[in-house]
Amino acid sequence: METPRLMCTQHPDSTVKVPVQEEVEEAVRSFLVYGCDEVMSDYEGKLTPYAQPKEIVVKAGELGVPVGEGFYVTVRAPNPRLEDFDRVDLALEAAVLANYYSYKRLGVQAVRWVVLPMTDSAETVRLVQRLLARKTRVLCEEVGQPCEQAQLVPLLEDVDSLLRVREILRDLHSALAELGSDPGVLRVFLGKSDSALKAGHIASALSLLYALGESAKAGEELGLEVKPILGGGSPPFRGGVNNPRLVGVEVQRYRGYSTVTVQSAVRYDASFSEYQEVRSKLLGGAGGEPGDAGGRVAELARLAASMYRSLASKYLDFVNEYARSVPTTRDRVSWREYGRALELEDKLFSAPRAIVYTAAWYSLGVPPTFLDADFVLEAYRGDFLDEVLGYLPGLEEEWRYDAQFYLPRLAGERLGEELVKKVDEALDAMGLRPEPLEPYEKLARTAPAELRALLLGKVRGFLG
């Protein structure tokens, strides 16, 4: 069985609203029109119907999609540490139920993987994998369907977890062995967005490079294949892998992924010809050997994370205020109920989820990529900026891309001149001169607050 290469997701990063009632049809279009061989049915912080995975399987099967044979439905379940246990239980039940119907109608297993977000402990991995195995066993014993259990896919979404990927893969392998399973392949999901929110763009990018290399080493150690899923979106801060302007440099940087996410913005805010070009480059980059992420990668990631948190935490009150006007383009639980936290020393600062956070920073006139300004200046003055650029080819191109959305006068009015001065100095250190798009700056100043984030997103080609 081949591992899927393109995973279409339900991320709310587009300016086009997709209500939950349309997501089954959307999943089928993802197979037939967008050429994804895997679709994610997402329950994390989201109001997804219990029967959605089953309905995708049934509808796709009716339209001739060979679900379970080259095309798969993957469920993202909530993490029981972060959401109510009944939501976790029902999401796992939904995955098992979808397989019941896929066996009954098509004779194959459609849901082979269940993603566990925010994975950071062996205990949670073991708990969820055990629950999944027991639910599968009960159904197969009672109705006679095959007892192939879906495999847990840990989603690592912070710098610390990404740097510990080998340890987490050992724990997953051990948990599967305890349940009598001996897989030849493990998948691990490496997330760019939340790790960037918590630690900044540079730290998350460095950690991702490290995790891709360590995943390959873990496979050698365990005597199996590890197939990483690269999770990223359109803005540089969230990975840039779906961005028509940046996808070429991103697939070179993040070599070693087997699967990559295709999020909503590139499907709905880009032209279809642009989408096809992105898809082609993503497929061309899949399955390559990871680059060398040795040297000081982990050390630099931790330093960059610390400096980003010190800077970003000063402005979170402004970000949280502007986040209220960012529209919701999926039926998700409000970020005020299910948000994120930015940790600085012994304090936790409340923040929106990554897409809303990203959109809010753009609305304030500062692309969140530039929140690494202190680190860039430290690297420049300490004469190790070239070392950082060597690890992160394309960083200059990302900053050049985001410079067109940097509005220093507006940012100075809303956030103060101190941040603007730092960003200007960092851009100068990178050899870049910002040239804001004129219509973009005009919209940022004159659009009504409730429409501003959406209209700016339409110009950029992504909400956040």
UniProtKB/Swiss-Prot annotation:
Q: Which reaction does it catalyse?
A: oxaloacetate + phosphate = phosphoenolpyruvate + hydrogencarbonate
Tell me which stretches of the chain form a coiled coil: none
Q: Which Pfam families does this UniProt record tie to the protein?
A: PEPcase_2
Instruction: Recall the GO molecular function terms of this protein's record.
Output: magnesium ion binding; phosphoenolpyruvate carboxylase activity
Q: Give the keywords, sorted.
A: Carbon dioxide fixation, Lyase, Magnesium
Q: Does the keyword Lyase apply?
A: yes
Q: Which cofactor names does the annotation list?
A: Mg(2+)
| Alphabetical GO biological process terms | carbon fixation; oxaloacetate metabolic process; tricarboxylic acid cycle
| UniProt EC number | 4.1.1.31
Lyase among keywords: yes
Q: What's the superkingdom here?
A: Archaea
Q: What class of enzyme is it?
A: lyase
The record's section on HAMAP family has: PEPcase_type2 (MF_01904)
Instruction: Report the sequence similarity comment from the record.
Output: Belongs to the PEPCase type 2 family.
**Subunit organization:** Homotetramer.
The record describes the protein's role as:
Catalyzes the irreversible beta-carboxylation of phosphoenolpyruvate (PEP) to form oxaloacetate (OAA), a four-carbon dicarboxylic acid source for the tricarboxylic acid cycle.
Name of the molecule in the record: Phosphoenolpyruvate carboxylase
Q: Which organism is it from?
A: Thermofilum pendens (strain DSM 2475 / Hrk 5)
